[in-house]
Amino acid sequence: MLIRSISGIRGLVNEDLGEKTIIKYAHALHDYLQDGVIYVGRDSRPSGEEIVEIMINELIKLGRTIMYCGIVPTPTIQYMVHTTEAIGGVIITASHNPIEWNGIKLSLIHI
């Protein structure tokens, strides 16, 4: 089951959170945000590497400028969004959920 919250989504990797869902959220982010830099980071979950690659590649295809920060704590992306000229950020994390889970958390200048 995909869990939706105010800041993003979480789910079982390759079941609830697969390539189709990741691409769908990349397009939603693109449609919502104005032009500008999007920061992307992830936690150390093994699945994060593939998810971040899909997300970044899709956003680049849509013409977005991406600053990839690698493995960082969630507050790092939030800080970068709110202290730079960025218009948004994405952190790939499932916080306290089991390792089989991952998620897409958004940090937007409008929130």
What are these regions (language model features)?
Residues 1-65:
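An N-terminal, well-structured beta->alpha segment
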Residues 2, 109-111:
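Conserved small/polar residues in nucleotide/adenosyl-binding loops
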